[in-house]
Design a protein with these regions (language model features):
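Generic helix N-cap/helix-start motif at coil->alpha-helix transitions
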Residues: 41-49
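Amphipathic alpha-helical repeat scaffolds
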Residues: 49-54, 94
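Extended amphipathic alpha-helical interaction segments
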Residues: 112-194, 198
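A cross-kingdom marker for long, charged
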Residues: 39, 201-227
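Hydrophobic/aromatic side-chain positions at a characteristic register within alpha-helices
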Residues: 56, 97-100
Protein backbone atom coordinates (compact mmCIF):
# COMPACT_ATOMS: atom_id res chain seq x y z
CA UNK A 1 0.00 0.00 0.00
CA UNK A 2 1.48 3.38 -0.97
CA UNK A 3 1.97 6.19 1.57
CA UNK A 4 -0.78 8.23 -0.09
CA UNK A 5 -3.25 5.36 -0.02
CA UNK A 6 -2.43 4.63 3.63
CA UNK A 7 -3.25 8.26 4.42
CA UNK A 8 -6.53 8.03 2.54
CA UNK A 9 -7.45 4.84 4.38
CA UNK A 10 -6.56 6.40 7.72
CA UNK A 11 -8.77 9.43 7.03
CA UNK A 12 -11.63 7.18 5.98
CA UNK A 13 -11.32 5.16 9.17
CA UNK A 14 -12.75 7.92 11.35
CA UNK A 15 -15.83 6.41 12.91
CA UNK A 16 -17.46 4.57 10.00
CA UNK A 17 -19.91 1.85 10.86
CA UNK A 18 -21.26 0.40 14.11
CA UNK A 19 -19.23 -1.79 16.48
CA UNK A 20 -18.90 -5.47 15.68
CA UNK A 21 -21.31 -7.89 17.33
CA UNK A 22 -20.20 -11.35 18.29
CA UNK A 23 -22.01 -13.83 16.02
CA UNK A 24 -23.96 -16.76 17.36
CA UNK A 25 -25.55 -19.80 15.76
CA UNK A 26 -27.46 -19.59 12.46
CA UNK A 27 -26.19 -16.11 11.62
CA UNK A 28 -27.45 -14.51 14.82
CA UNK A 29 -25.53 -12.40 17.33
CA UNK A 30 -24.99 -13.57 20.89
CA UNK A 31 -28.05 -11.65 22.15
CA UNK A 32 -30.38 -13.29 19.65
CA UNK A 33 -30.23 -10.37 17.24
CA UNK A 34 -29.21 -10.78 13.58
CA UNK A 35 -25.43 -10.81 13.17
CA UNK A 36 -23.58 -7.85 11.63
CA UNK A 37 -23.60 -9.67 8.30
CA UNK A 38 -27.41 -9.50 8.37
CA UNK A 39 -27.84 -6.04 9.90
CA UNK A 40 -26.66 -3.07 7.84
CA UNK A 41 -27.73 0.37 6.63
CA UNK A 42 -28.86 0.00 2.99
CA UNK A 43 -28.48 3.71 2.22
CA UNK A 44 -24.97 3.90 3.63
CA UNK A 45 -23.82 0.71 1.90
CA UNK A 46 -25.31 1.88 -1.40
CA UNK A 47 -23.62 5.27 -1.16
CA UNK A 48 -20.21 3.71 -0.50
CA UNK A 49 -20.54 1.17 -3.30
CA UNK A 50 -21.65 3.93 -5.66
CA UNK A 51 -18.44 5.80 -4.82
CA UNK A 52 -16.41 2.65 -5.46
CA UNK A 53 -18.04 2.19 -8.87
CA UNK A 54 -17.52 5.80 -9.97
CA UNK A 55 -13.92 5.78 -8.76
CA UNK A 56 -13.29 2.45 -10.49
CA UNK A 57 -14.45 3.62 -13.90
CA UNK A 58 -12.59 6.92 -13.58
CA UNK A 59 -9.53 4.96 -12.36
CA UNK A 60 -9.39 7.15 -9.26
CA UNK A 61 -7.86 4.50 -7.03
CA UNK A 62 -7.49 6.61 -3.85
CA UNK A 63 -11.26 7.24 -4.01
CA UNK A 64 -11.85 3.52 -4.49
CA UNK A 65 -9.71 2.72 -1.44
CA UNK A 66 -11.37 5.34 0.77
CA UNK A 67 -14.85 4.15 -0.16
CA UNK A 68 -13.79 0.51 0.22
CA UNK A 69 -12.71 1.15 3.81
CA UNK A 70 -16.19 2.41 4.61
CA UNK A 71 -17.83 -0.34 2.58
CA UNK A 72 -15.96 -3.15 4.33
CA UNK A 73 -16.46 -1.57 7.76
CA UNK A 74 -20.17 -0.87 7.26
CA UNK A 75 -20.89 -4.11 5.44
CA UNK A 76 -18.94 -6.52 7.62
CA UNK A 77 -18.31 -4.63 10.89
CA UNK A 78 -14.91 -6.25 11.43
CA UNK A 79 -12.21 -4.74 13.66
CA UNK A 80 -10.13 -1.97 12.14
CA UNK A 81 -7.11 -4.12 11.32
CA UNK A 82 -9.24 -6.54 9.31
CA UNK A 83 -11.26 -3.68 7.82
CA UNK A 84 -8.17 -1.91 6.45
CA UNK A 85 -6.69 -5.19 5.25
CA UNK A 86 -9.99 -6.11 3.61
CA UNK A 87 -10.32 -2.71 1.91
CA UNK A 88 -6.83 -3.08 0.47
CA UNK A 89 -7.79 -6.51 -0.88
CA UNK A 90 -10.92 -5.05 -2.49
CA UNK A 91 -8.83 -2.33 -4.13
CA UNK A 92 -6.26 -4.83 -5.45
CA UNK A 93 -8.98 -7.15 -6.76
CA UNK A 94 -10.51 -4.24 -8.68
CA UNK A 95 -7.16 -3.14 -10.06
CA UNK A 96 -6.36 -6.67 -11.21
CA UNK A 97 -9.77 -7.04 -12.83
CA UNK A 98 -9.92 -3.59 -14.45
CA UNK A 99 -7.78 -3.96 -17.62
CA UNK A 100 -9.59 -5.11 -20.74
CA UNK A 101 -9.02 -7.57 -22.27
CA UNK A 102 -5.80 -8.44 -20.43
CA UNK A 103 -6.96 -8.57 -16.83
CA UNK A 104 -5.96 -11.14 -14.19
CA UNK A 105 -9.07 -12.94 -12.89
CA UNK A 106 -7.07 -15.55 -10.97
CA UNK A 107 -5.26 -12.98 -8.85
CA UNK A 108 -8.45 -10.94 -8.43
CA UNK A 109 -10.17 -14.10 -7.19
CA UNK A 110 -7.30 -14.75 -4.78
CA UNK A 111 -7.71 -11.26 -3.28
CA UNK A 112 -11.43 -11.81 -2.77
CA UNK A 113 -10.77 -15.24 -1.23
CA UNK A 114 -8.51 -13.56 1.33
CA UNK A 115 -11.22 -10.96 2.04
CA UNK A 116 -13.85 -13.64 2.66
CA UNK A 117 -11.35 -15.53 4.81
CA UNK A 118 -11.15 -12.42 7.03
CA UNK A 119 -14.94 -12.35 7.24
CA UNK A 120 -14.98 -16.03 8.19
CA UNK A 121 -12.43 -15.38 10.95
CA UNK A 122 -14.81 -12.78 12.38
CA UNK A 123 -18.16 -14.56 11.94
CA UNK A 124 -17.58 -18.19 11.02
CA UNK A 125 -19.09 -17.64 7.56
CA UNK A 126 -18.99 -17.95 4.62
CA UNK A 127 -18.13 -21.60 5.07
CA UNK A 128 -15.91 -21.69 2.00
CA UNK A 129 -14.12 -18.38 1.24
CA UNK A 130 -12.79 -19.78 -2.04
CA UNK A 131 -16.31 -20.54 -3.26
CA UNK A 132 -17.54 -17.11 -2.19
CA UNK A 133 -14.67 -15.50 -4.10
CA UNK A 134 -15.39 -17.60 -7.18
CA UNK A 135 -19.05 -16.53 -7.12
CA UNK A 136 -18.04 -12.89 -6.62
CA UNK A 137 -15.70 -12.83 -9.60
CA UNK A 138 -18.21 -14.79 -11.66
CA UNK A 139 -20.67 -11.90 -11.58
CA UNK A 140 -17.83 -9.58 -12.56
CA UNK A 141 -17.29 -11.84 -15.56
CA UNK A 142 -20.99 -11.88 -16.41
CA UNK A 143 -21.12 -8.10 -16.22
CA UNK A 144 -18.08 -7.65 -18.44
CA UNK A 145 -19.52 -10.01 -21.03
CA UNK A 146 -22.77 -8.05 -20.91
CA UNK A 147 -20.88 -4.77 -21.39
CA UNK A 148 -19.41 -6.06 -24.64
CA UNK A 149 -22.42 -8.01 -25.89
CA UNK A 150 -24.17 -7.05 -29.10
CA UNK A 151 -27.63 -8.12 -27.94
CA UNK A 152 -29.62 -6.38 -25.16
CA UNK A 153 -30.10 -8.42 -22.04
CA UNK A 154 -33.42 -9.48 -20.56
CA UNK A 155 -34.64 -9.61 -16.97
CA UNK A 156 -33.64 -13.27 -16.53
CA UNK A 157 -30.11 -12.94 -17.82
CA UNK A 158 -26.90 -14.50 -16.58
CA UNK A 159 -25.88 -11.37 -14.66
CA UNK A 160 -28.97 -11.48 -12.45
CA UNK A 161 -28.49 -15.21 -11.94
CA UNK A 162 -24.82 -14.85 -10.98
CA UNK A 163 -25.54 -12.11 -8.42
CA UNK A 164 -28.42 -14.20 -7.06
CA UNK A 165 -26.10 -17.18 -6.59
CA UNK A 166 -23.59 -15.02 -4.72
CA UNK A 167 -26.17 -13.53 -2.36
CA UNK A 168 -27.79 -16.91 -1.76
CA UNK A 169 -24.47 -18.48 -0.84
CA UNK A 170 -23.18 -15.64 1.33
CA UNK A 171 -26.34 -15.45 3.44
CA UNK A 172 -27.52 -19.06 3.20
CA UNK A 173 -30.86 -17.95 1.80
CA UNK A 174 -33.02 -19.51 -0.95
CA UNK A 175 -32.21 -17.87 -4.26
CA UNK A 176 -35.83 -16.81 -4.70
CA UNK A 177 -35.53 -14.65 -1.55
CA UNK A 178 -32.53 -12.65 -2.78
CA UNK A 179 -33.33 -12.45 -6.50
CA UNK A 180 -35.06 -9.05 -6.24
CA UNK A 181 -31.88 -7.57 -4.77
CA UNK A 182 -29.93 -9.02 -7.69
CA UNK A 183 -32.39 -7.52 -10.19
CA UNK A 184 -31.94 -4.05 -8.68
CA UNK A 185 -28.16 -4.48 -8.66
CA UNK A 186 -28.19 -5.43 -12.33
CA UNK A 187 -30.30 -2.34 -13.04
CA UNK A 188 -27.68 -0.20 -11.29
CA UNK A 189 -25.03 -1.77 -13.53
CA UNK A 190 -27.12 -1.01 -16.63
CA UNK A 191 -27.24 2.65 -15.62
CA UNK A 192 -23.52 2.69 -14.85
CA UNK A 193 -22.74 1.20 -18.26
CA UNK A 194 -24.92 3.81 -19.96
CA UNK A 195 -23.10 6.54 -18.02
CA UNK A 196 -19.78 5.17 -19.31
CA UNK A 197 -21.02 5.07 -22.90
CA UNK A 198 -22.12 8.70 -22.58
CA UNK A 199 -18.70 9.86 -21.44
CA UNK A 200 -18.69 9.58 -17.62
CA UNK A 201 -20.02 13.10 -17.12
CA UNK A 202 -19.98 14.06 -13.41
CA UNK A 203 -23.28 15.94 -13.80
CA UNK A 204 -25.04 13.10 -15.63
CA UNK A 205 -28.68 12.53 -14.57
CA UNK A 206 -27.90 8.81 -14.74
CA UNK A 207 -25.78 8.92 -11.58
CA UNK A 208 -28.65 9.60 -9.12
CA UNK A 209 -30.64 6.82 -10.80
CA UNK A 210 -27.70 4.43 -10.38
CA UNK A 211 -27.40 5.39 -6.72
CA UNK A 212 -31.14 4.86 -6.18
CA UNK A 213 -30.98 1.41 -7.80
CA UNK A 214 -28.20 0.43 -5.39
CA UNK A 215 -30.29 1.64 -2.44
CA UNK A 216 -33.18 -0.53 -3.64
CA UNK A 217 -30.78 -3.46 -4.04
CA UNK A 218 -29.55 -3.28 -0.45
CA UNK A 219 -33.01 -2.57 0.95
CA UNK A 220 -34.29 -5.73 -0.76
CA UNK A 221 -31.27 -7.68 0.47
CA UNK A 222 -31.77 -6.51 4.05
CA UNK A 223 -35.44 -7.51 3.89
CA UNK A 224 -34.39 -11.00 2.79
CA UNK A 225 -31.61 -11.66 5.30
CA UNK A 226 -32.43 -9.65 8.46
CA UNK A 227 -33.62 -12.45 10.71
Amino acid sequence: MTTRMKAVAARAAGGLGPPRLRPGPAGRAAGGRPSRLRSFDPGRIADLEYRVWVGYYLRQWPQVLAASVGLVRTGFGMDWYRTLHGAWLVLRANQLWAPFPDNDPDRARACMRRLYALVKLSYGEPANPAKAAALEVDWWRAHREMQHATQPRGTGDELVESVTRLYGYLYGEPEAEVRLAAVHRARAMDLSDQWIREGCRPDSPLLPLEHAALVRCYAALLAAVHH
